[in-house]
Regions:
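Sec-dependent bacterial lipoprotein signal peptides
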Residues: 1-18
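Acidic, low-complexity intrinsically disordered segments
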Residues: 19-133
Length: 133
């Protein structure tokens, strides 16, 4: 009986060592940048999807960022300020080794005059790995 238990424990140890070779991921930060056809944007709403999302933060002090974690795979972010094309905010993600597994969509845009943009087809979001300090 004791030999059977020891054998099963040994087998469990071997099976545990044979896990996924990709590991558990490398948590970190991705920078979310805006591509905009306009120069007078005042607010943008963005949805970011991917695994292991936890939070968002502004990049720099010239914008205000509000976010809501919908699930572990979706975060909704609203950014206010005198927005220009380029980095807007960062998101903490489950695996920065694969930024291509994360995506973002612009869902609404307002001009600095507070008027909603009717056409947001020229807007896009780009996610890149944050530079190490």
């Amino acid at each position: 009986m004791r030999a059977t238990i020891l054998g099963l424990l040994g087998l469990l140890g071997v099976l545990a060592a044979c896990g996924d070779s990709t590991g558990t991921g490398s948590p970190g930060t991705l920078v979310v940048s805006l591509e905009s056809p306009n120069t007078d944007d005042g607010a943008v709403a963005v949805s970011v999807t991917g695994t292991g999302l936890t939070s968002a933060a502004p990049v720099g002090s010239s914008v205000r960022v509000f976010w809501r974690l919908v699930s572990e795979t979706e975060i909704q972010v609203i950014v206010f300020g005198n927005l220009t094309a380029g980095p807007l905010f960062s998101v903490n993600v489950g695996d920065v080794r694969h930024p291509d597994r994360y995506s973002g969509d612009v869902t609404q845009v307002a001009a600095r005059s507070d008027a909603l943009r009717d056409d947001i087809s020229g807007y896009a979001i780009r996610l890149t790995r944050a530079e190490s300090p």
